[in-house]
Amino acid sequence: DNAMSMNKDKDFGTPPIDTEQMVNLEIDGFKVTAPAGTSIMRAAASIGIDIPKLCATDSIEPFGSCRLCVVQIEGGRGMPASCTTPVAEGLKVVTQNQKLAEVRRGVMELYISDHPLDCLTCSANGDCELQDMAGAVGLREVRYTPVQTHLNAEKDTSNPYFTFDPSKCIVCSRCVRACEETQGTFALTIDGRGFDSKVSPGQNEAFMNSECVSCGACVQACPTATLMEKSIIDHGQPEHAIITTCAYCGVGCSFRAEMKGEQVIRMVPHKDGKANHGHSCVKGRFAFGYATHK
């Protein structure tokens, strides 16, 4: 039975490590065995402990920029990021306590202070990791009254398949890394420093004028509605999904066809696809209009 609900594939935060060597450690009092080199985040996720994260996703290498996933290690100093800290024999890791909760809420508050609070009209409509993490860290108010924000940044709608709305960008760099690691096109960079950092296609160009090949890896990597499929903006979030195979060429990429009733709203490369491992080209990803063409 290929039909499935909208349950997304679990995101372990960092990619799996392929090694025979195993390491034993303790996370929140639970004993865990994980391959050497695995991140603390992934090891925790493997036993059902989901450490809050924004810049980490298991299709790309860890980056350690959002600072939401900090943990404490017994006998260790400070609060290392669990996405970039590998497991080690005998480690005792704490992922939840009062101090960590305060730090995470503080970090989250800063993100939200420069983010439009238009969740009611946002096309992400609940499919938003920023919203999820605000809930996960227990953020209930934002005390900052920002003097400077990016809320008036101009939208780029030049790409026929997706829009880029920098006002919603949290500069997690997931799109830049997906373009680099998954697709290998290097169309995106982070331009500027500090508060002026922004995602830039090419040399500050529109998406359509950059090197972008419209593969959609960046859209899939984006945790907010900054990069969003135009089909979702037009039709809203899908309600159910079916695993299917792309019919364009002989590679046989596996997809989740996300649907609303009988209508395909979005094609998402299936993470467990043996031929494509969660990636695809523009044809399978966006050119699905023929499927229901009359």
Residue locations for each model-derived region?
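Fe-S ferredoxin-like electron-transfer domains
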Residues: 3-12, 67-71, 76-214, 219-245, ...
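Catalytic and ligand-binding motifs that coordinate phosphates/metal ions
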Residues: 242-272
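Short, surface-exposed charged micro-motifs
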Residues: 31, 187, 254-256
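Generic start-of-chain signal for non-secretory N-termini
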Residues: 2-35
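Conserved active-site and cofactor/substrate-binding residues in soluble primary-metabolism enzymes
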Residues: 35, 98, 102, 170, ...
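Cofactor-/ligand-binding subdomain signature composed of acidic, glycine-rich
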Residues: 260-294
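A short, compositionally biased
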Residues: 16-23, 65-69, 249-253
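N-terminal cofactor/phosphate-binding cores enriched in small/glycine residues
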Residues: 23-89, 98-103
